[in-house]
Every structure is written in C-alpha cells, then in structure tokens.
Amino acid sequence: MAVERQWLQSWFEGTPVRIEQRSASAFSVSVPRSFCFEAGATQVLPPLAALLDKVAQSLKRQPEARLLRVAAPGDAGAAPALALQRAEAVRRQLLANGVPASRMAAPSAGEGAVVLLRVGFAP
C-alpha cells in the first residue's frame, strides 16, 4: 500500500488533499469539504471528482485492495442526512469510475469537515 500512497501523493502534492499511512496495509485520503461540495448540496465538485478518479485507478492497480471507509461530512447546522447523502454521492462516483460495489464499505456520515477514504486490505 505504500507504493499506492506515494503514487497518489505525487498527484496531489501542493494541494489540500492529505494522504497518510495508517498501517502497513492501509492509508487514508482526506479532502476538505469546501473542495468537495457546495453548501447544502450533494453534487461532487470537480476537485473531488479528480481525486476519486485517481483513487479508482489506484484500486484497479491493486485488485486485492478495498475502500474500508467512505465518509463525507455534512454542513454546520444541516440535517445529519446530508452527510450520508454526500457519502453516497462519493460512492456513486467511484462506481462510475469502475470500482465494484463489492470492494467498498457502505457509505457513512463523516465527522469533522473532510471527505475521508480509507484504502487498504480487508482483515
């Protein structure tokens, strides 16, 4: 997974995207909400779409890897359902990029103000 983490980092160096090794077999990718969704909306913005395309490419290069977590935040003061709807939009974008549903965790509402993906090998 270190090779895939480094490959993704090379694409997003100098951007607000954070890619961090979590263990020998997993890394996380986080993107600030402002680069992902307009306030109150669930449509994926182009910066997040570009990142999801690269994550999909990475998963295709590592057929045993999975998305262990797909989480998105809501907006301050918004209904909690917004976060889950956004996570579902992220998942749909990954499906459209060729990532099979069987390789993704169910979408979840995230905490904080970032879209969070955890990539790794299932235990």
Residue ranges of model-derived segments:
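Short, surface-exposed beta-strand segments enriched in small/polar/acidic residues
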Residues: 30-38, 52-87, 104-111
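N-terminal targeting leaders that direct proteins to extracytoplasmic destinations
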Residues: 1-26
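Periplasmic OmpA/Pal-like peptidoglycan-binding modules at the C-termini of bacterial envelope proteins
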Residues: 85-123
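Short, glycine-rich nucleotide/cofactor-binding loops
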Residues: 40-48
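Structured segments of extracytoplasmic/periplasmic soluble domains
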Residues: 10-15, 54-62, 90-100
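A generic structural signal for beta-strand entry/edge sites
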Residues: 24-28, 112-114
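Extracytoplasmic/secreted proteins, especially bacterial periplasmic and envelope-associated proteins
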Residues: 3, 7, 47-54, 85-89
